[in-house]
Amino acid sequence: MARVKRGVVAHAKHKKVLKQAEGFYGRRKNTIRAAKAAVDRSKQYAYRDRKNRKRIFRALWIQRINAAVRAEGLTYGRFIDGLSKAGIEIDRKVLSDIAVHESAAFSALVASAKKALEYLRDTTSNAFEGAVK
């Protein structure tokens, strides 16, 4: 069986890892063993944080919507409830963008949510009054 010299393959692998470790501090950018450990860990963090980013942005959108809705005299939960009862299906990302950049349009959305909440409150209270008498 012929002897296999792995120098070229090993050098290419090491070069690839060291290329990924560019910008790291200290031994982690020079030594292959430290660089490999650091690159592996950085990939784990990147995988985890791609999932976390979605949660973080959703929380940010909710905070922005809540702040804008409270200025209009509603809470976030009541606003979302009113939108669903009014049949308006806009996701939180778009709602927060509208709240930040187009306040007039957002005020119209809040008004329609309030109207839907009041309409349902009036119809349910009338039904209960008839049952009590």
Curated annotation (Swiss-Prot):
PROSITE patterns: RIBOSOMAL_L20. One of its GO terms (cellular component) is ribosome. CDD domains: Ribosomal_L20. One of its GO terms (biological process) is ribosomal large subunit assembly. Keywords: Ribonucleoprotein, Ribosomal protein, RNA-binding, rRNA-binding. Pfam families: Ribosomal_L20. NCBIfam families: rplT_bact (TIGR01032). Binds directly to 23S ribosomal RNA and is necessary for the in vitro assembly process of the 50S ribosomal subunit. It is not involved in the protein synthesizing functions of that subunit. This is Large ribosomal subunit protein bL20.
